[in-house]
A protein has these predicted regions:
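Short, strongly hydrophobic alpha-helical membrane anchors
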Residues: 1-18
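Juxtamembrane helix-loop boundaries in multi-pass membrane proteins
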Residues: 15-17, 21-25, 48-70, 113-131, ...
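Membrane-water interface of transmembrane alpha-helices
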Residues: 30-42, 93-109, 173
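Membrane-interface helix-loop junction between the first two transmembrane segments
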Residues: 35-55
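Hydrophobic alpha-helical transmembrane segments in multi-pass integral membrane proteins
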Residues: 68-75, 128-146
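Membrane-proximal helix-loop-helix units in multi-pass membrane proteins
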Residues: 74-131
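Small-residue-rich transmembrane alpha-helices that serve as helix-helix interface/gating elements
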Residues: 88-93, 152-167
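C-terminal transmembrane-bundle signature of multipass membrane proteins
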Residues: 159-186
């Protein structure tokens, strides 16, 4: 490490300070809304498979938001090593959590042929495993090369991806695309 390298690394993460603060706040707010949405939506559905699907989707959205929240909060303490370590830990936690959620959804038949949203369920599971694996690999690479601004930027973009993934799952949990207002009847 050259004499000015530590300052460059600190400056790079400093460029994202506002992003990390906003990310922590946004993920906490969306987590609260997600809990309310799941409570409301699951209360009116008697189908166990649909409830399990929603629970798995909400759980995976929850994992993504918790990942973004903790990585962002810890990143505010500064340093590429801290940022890399928080990404590493959260990626491992989320991979284990995703494995558990997928197992439950599989037992409930959410990946069975003929299940109405089978392809979407498989896509969400694949995106989760892939995204957290990418986060894990980038975190390991950053810990090996803490001066790499490209790796730091890539991990910041992973956080953006986590938000997108969580919002897509939360949208699907609510069932908004499938719920339509009744057609008006002419009187």
């Amino acid at each position: 490490m050259q004499p000015g390298d530590a300052r460059k690394v600190a400056l790079l993460l400093g460029h994202y300070e506002m992003f990390f603060a906003a990310s922590a706040g946004a993920s906490a707010a969306i987590l609260g809304l997600l809990v309310v949405a799941v409570s409301v939506v699951n209360s009116d559905d008697a189908d166990a498979k649909t409830r399990e699907r929603r629970t798995a989707l909400a759980g995976s959205a929850f994992l993504a938001l918790v990942d973004a929240f903790f990585v962002s909060i810890v990143a505010l303490t500064g340093g590429a090593t801290v940022f890399g370590t928080s990404n590493l830990v959260m990626a491992m936690v989320c991979l284990l959590g995703t494995r558990s959620l997928v197992s439950g959804a599989k037992r409930a038949g959410n990946f069975s042929r003929g299940f109405p949203t089978r392809r979407l369920n498989i896509a969400f599971a694949t995106i989760s495993f892939g995204g957290y694996s990418i986060q894990l690999g980038l975190a390991i690479a950053l810990l090996a090369d803490a001066q790499s601004s490209a790796l730091q930027r890539a991990l910041v973009l992973v956080l953006v991806g986590l938000f997108g993934s969580a919002l897509a799952r939360a949208w699907e949990v609510t069932g908004i695309p499938r719920r339509r207002l009744p057609e008006p009847t002419d009187r």
